Amino acid sequence: MKKAIYFFLILMLTASIQVGAQSLDGTWKGVLSVGSQKLTLILHVSEAERSAKLDVMEQGAKGLPLTVNVMENDSLNVAMTQIGLHYAGRLRNGVIEGTFSQNSFTTQLIFNKGEVVQKRPQEPKPPFPYRVENIQFENQSAKGTLSGTLTYPEGYKEGQKVSVVLMVTGSGPQNRDEELMGHKPFLVLADRLARHGIASLRYDDRGVGQSTGDFSSATTAALATDALAGIKYLRGLKKFSCVGILGHSEGGSIAYMLGAGGNADFIVSLAGPACKFDTLMMLQLNGLSKVQGAKEDVVHSVAETRQLLLSKDNSLWMKSALDMNFSKFLPLIKCPVMALSGSNDLNVPAEFNMLSLQNGLPHNSKNVIKIYPGLNHLFQHSPTGNPLDDVNIDETMSEEVMNDVCTWINKVTNNNH
């Protein structure tokens, strides 16, 4: 009997030690339900630094600093006052149970310990069968240095003339891999190009990564000068037979701008706006709101669209972008153009944008204008095109799109690969 009591006391003591050893420290994962949408929240807690940060996976937000009100024993109370966000929870049995609120919205939210493991099967891993160089080039007009990665084709030999593409990212500050939603589209695409005999240069946006400069004050026109500096750098190397530009989203519009100035030997535009930007934004706002549950249009005119956007973002970039009409550059382009879109692209609606291209581009038998069924703005297969789903899609970019891009570039540049 005494042995039984003694054994029971040992169990109780062990349990109490385990409970007492529970710690808020580490990475926690929770799923927030907002209507029909689900957001994956990652909470990073450091008891030693008494700090907490938040990632919102579907929105590509990382390291958002939280104000710590309480971090003691099993209790956690954090907030982000500027957006009215608040979370109060308690650690029980290895999970944090609590209440999430933002302004008038309140719901229960549970965090489980652990990282989010994302599958990215297309992402290349070293060692690579091609040469890669970290380089820098100067934008003299902006007094900035852009840092990037120059990737040579598989089997490249010094003195061999090959085609090269300058890769230009979409809107917002992005690194050379155009990293967003846990994907690295430009890394994946650069790898595919190299394996098809095509060199590429991708670079960090100004003020991002290893590039200098101030992104916050940059307009699309200013960012185009960065891309132009990249083209001049590539031509100055005297290693390449043809220098083209490949841009995604805003980068695709920059490709049209530089093509109109005769700066590129060929253009690949991946969902690049080729129309009036304010009209495009009206279609975008209504399309995105409907896929996320709205039953009616949120804006009914271009004027209303401009007013709504400027009330939320009064930056120099937004002001200038709303006045841009990218269709004016199209008639001036003399080089071959490959313009691609996905039918489920809600950011740059394909039918509307492609109509502008068909009407604006001069006839060129080498031009390709194509809409891929079922692809979203990132050229992933997506049933709805909802950007909130991007992070949960394993595919980074459609195999068909990447192969078509490589085949077309080799064809228009007479690169026999």
Identify the residue ranges that each predicted region occupies:
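Accessory cap/linker subdomain of secreted extracellular hydrolases
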Residues: 262-332, 347
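Short alpha-helix in the alpha/beta-hydrolase fold that links the catalytic acid
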Residues: 335, 346-360
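Primarily recognizes the serine-hydrolase "nucleophile elbow" in alpha/beta-hydrolase
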Residues: 229-286
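Short beta-strand/loop motif that positions the catalytic acidic residue
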Residues: 333, 339-341
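Alpha/beta-hydrolase active-site loop
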Residues: 185, 216-237
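N-terminal cap/lid segment of alpha/beta-hydrolase-fold proteins
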Residues: 116-160
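Central antiparallel beta-sheet cores of small beta-barrel/beta-sandwich binding domains
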Residues: 22-91, 97-103, 122, 129-130, ...
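Short beta-strand element of the alpha/beta-hydrolase
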Residues: 160-170
